Amino acid sequence: MELITILEKTVSPDRLELEAAQKFLERAAVENLPTFLVELSRVLANPGNSQVARVAAGLQIKNSLTSKDPDIKAQYQQRWLAIDANARREVKNYVLQTLGTETYRPSSASQCVAGIACAEIPVSQWPELIPQLVANVTNPNSTEHMKESTLEAIGYICQDIDPEQLQDKSNEILTAIIQGMRKEEPSNNVKLAATNALLNSLEFTKANFDKESERHFIMQVVCEATQCPDTRVRVAALQNLVKIMSLYYQYMETYMGPALFAITIEAMKSDIDEVALQGIEFWSNVCDEEMDLAIEASEAAEQGRPPEHTSKFYAKGALQYLVPILTQTLTKQDENDDDDDWNPCKAAGVCLMLLSTCCEDDIVPHVLPFIKEHIKNPDWRYRDAAVMAFGSILEGPEPNQLKPLVIQAMPTLIELMKDPSVVVRDTTAWTVGRICELLPEAAINDVYLAPLLQCLIEGLSAEPRVASNVCWAFSSLAEAAYEAADVADDQEEPATYCLSSSFELIVQKLLETTDRPDGHQNNLRSSAYESLMEIVKNSAKDCYPAVQKTTLVIMERLQQVLQMESHIQSTSDRIQFNDLQSLLCATLQNVLRKVQHQDALQISDVVMASLLRMFQSTAGSGGVQEDALMAVSTLVEVLGGEFLKYMEAFKPFLGIGLKNYAEYQVCLAAVGLVGDLCRALQSNILPFCDEVMQLLLENLGNENVHRSVKPQILSVFGDIALAIGGEFKKYLEVVLNTLQQASQAQVDKSDFDMVDYLNELRESCLEAYTGIVQGLKGDQENVHPDVMLVQPRVEFILSFIDHIAGDEDHTDGVVACAAGLIGDLCTAFGKDVLKLVEARPMIHELLTEGRRSKTNKAKTLATWATKELRKLKNQA
């Protein structure tokens, strides 16, 4: 009885009672988990207990078996499997007995069954479960509650378990699901549970979809369910069609004309949002699939082979029916629409964009009449829909087909930036931003640039949602203007460009925008800073005085922000404070890159002092530390060797960054900075190397360090060796052993992420070897004898390159690094290398591949390495 009372108190409004109950349950779970779970399952299984007690008991069981965190979940599953088999059997019997006895929804028992199943089925236990669940659904005497909760359990199992574990059970599971979905099934609750279960099982029913008769049957049942009067069932059935379209596109031709087309078009027209959303989602998915197929077709054509799968061009064929529904849906916007609410109006905009990318030129004639008819409509909803439709078709069609249309529309768009409706202004600003990004020639043409800039500058004072889009338009405009400017042959940046005359005003307005009191709304503050960064980055020489001014403003703001720290009251203040520091650091990086060397020297003391203060005050915030480290990197780039005077003061913070592997982005930034310091300070980095090397080696040996940090560390060894030359000898043995170990790493080749990682790791090993050989060899005509210390490893290094050559997954980057290293080995060790390379014909194939590469680096280095090998051959 005591347990029941305590379970009932887990929903008590009295905080003390609630906490006491939770403490008791936590203690019981720790003291004797098996007994606790058996007791809980008894409470759950007894229909005489209160609903509150049963639900709470189910929740306790479920939470002891599963977790959102995959690592904890795996631990819980192991812990369950370690429990005595009799106790487990008892719990399993009770939770199965509970199915069908609960009068409330959703069923607790179904979640418990699934939790246990996901632990036991992968280790081939509880073989009787699936047959028992199937029997529950197919037995004509089963109650509605029994069928519903059992189908829920099946759905949860399908959702959470690795599909391979259920492959051999897919027929039985499908039988139960289809039984529950049939139109003869009287209960909509059962139908819903079955339709949801089908949605979760689609990944592992491939064998059933491959057989025509079974596929017909599944498709028939799903299509019938889309006509169910119960909205919940209808939505779930449509969700199935959306997913089936992605998984089984190749099989859909039979069903498209007779059924799917009509069902989804009807759904798109529905007044019920959830139904309309699924109809639109279906066609968005068709576009996604057909774009992938178009890419596959062009790759196949390049390689002179037929594609594996071909597109049926459903989207193109349906344009004339889809576009009118989508443009009509665009007029259903909600005036106080919150950005986070997904609704048919937003989905229609996305679907139009996808159709535009997928069908290219073909979409324009279908959308243009709607735009022309409504862009000046007195009803704001239609004006907005017309602008939205216009903005949505800018990517996909041939730019030359769109350009005249856009230039023609420019005066209207400039006018709409002053529209009485904030929604229309917002959409117009977004559309102008897309024009600047995708068709910049239309935006920076002589006729409209001045009025466009005028309306954008005014737009920065509009509501946050409008101003935020204007900031983005400025970013794209600056980039386009910079790329269109004339650059003298010997110069890196243009002397002047089309934004020069308004540059100072734009920068001033953006700085004002970053200071707006409502800057936290719609991401306005960060959009304005990002826009400022783009504009400074893309500025011509005659804008330099304004860049100097901006630099001083940013530095002043950084100092002000650091003084605010003592006034922080709340967590939200702290978040805004950290965000502002990060934005200022990022902006600082951009202005520093533009600043001339002598100016940089004048401000560097103040900049460095601010950054050091920031490191001191934000030891707890990884995000700010990362941004501050990146800002130091930029300062190092700009100052070069002059940075040496700050090293003593900065060294402790570099150490803290290198040790902060818990926030691995910070650690990565610190490792990257070590490389920058080596390039800038050259041999002057020597006094700091012992400490840095020790931290780097500790990180490599620590398995809690995120794997993405390790390749970067290996590559930095090469930078250090290049910087300090012969002084690297004292680290040589340990570094070469580390590289030998890292270059033998193996990964699971079926996991694409791990294949990428392996390439990254190999590229870093090759870069490290290159730095070491070049550093020890010296840059004089005569090779320094220190390099002979690497001689014993040369054969291993070439075997490593040979191994890479034989791995078909190697990237261009790896080929380039390998070729560069071969060339360096030739110049350092001469004819010995030739013999070792001759014995490994795959290396020659790798160099041939490099010489034919589309990337410049691989081509240049492979050609050079081949020449070096040829030189040795001629000498021999």
Swiss-Prot record:
Importin N-terminal domain span: 21-101
Location of N-acetylmethionine modifications: 1
One of the GO BP terms on file: ribosomal protein import into nucleus
Positions annotated as HEAT repeat: 3-29, 32-62, 85-120, 129-160, 170-201, 212-247, 260-302, 314-359, 363-392, 399-438, 449-485, 500-537, 544-592, 597-639, 644-680, 686-724, 729-777, 785-828, 834-875
SMART domains documented for this protein: ARM (SM00185), IBN_N (SM00913)
Compartment list: Cytoplasm; Nucleus envelope
Subcellular location, principal: cytoplasm
InterPro entries in the record: ARM-like (IPR011989), ARM-type_fold (IPR016024), Armadillo (IPR000225), HEAT_type_2 (IPR021133), Importin-beta_N (IPR001494), Importin_beta (IPR040122)
Keyword terms, alphabetized: Acetylation, ADP-ribosylation, Cytoplasm, Nucleus, Phosphoprotein, Protein transport, Repeat, Transport
Pfam hit, one: HEAT_EZ
Record note on modification: Mono-ADP-ribosylated by PARP16.
Region (IAB-binding): 329-342
Presence of the UniProt keyword tRNA-binding in the record: no
Family in the record: Belongs to the importin beta family. Importin beta-1 subfamily.
Subunit description: Forms a complex with an importin alpha subunit. Interacts with XPO1. Forms a heterodimer with IPO7. The KPNB1/IPO7 heterodimer interacts with H1 histone. Interacts with SNUPN. Interacts with H2A, H2B, H3 and H4 histones. Component of an import snRNP complex composed of KPNB1, SNUPN, SMN1 and ZNF259. Component of a nuclear export receptor complex composed of KPNB1, Ran, SNUPN and XPO1. Interacts with SRY. Interacts with PRKCI/atypical protein kinase C iota. Interacts with KPNA2. Interacts with KPNA7. Interacts with SNAI1 (via zinc fingers) and SNAI2 (via zinc fingers).
Protein's name in the database: Importin subunit beta-1
Source species of the chain: Mus musculus
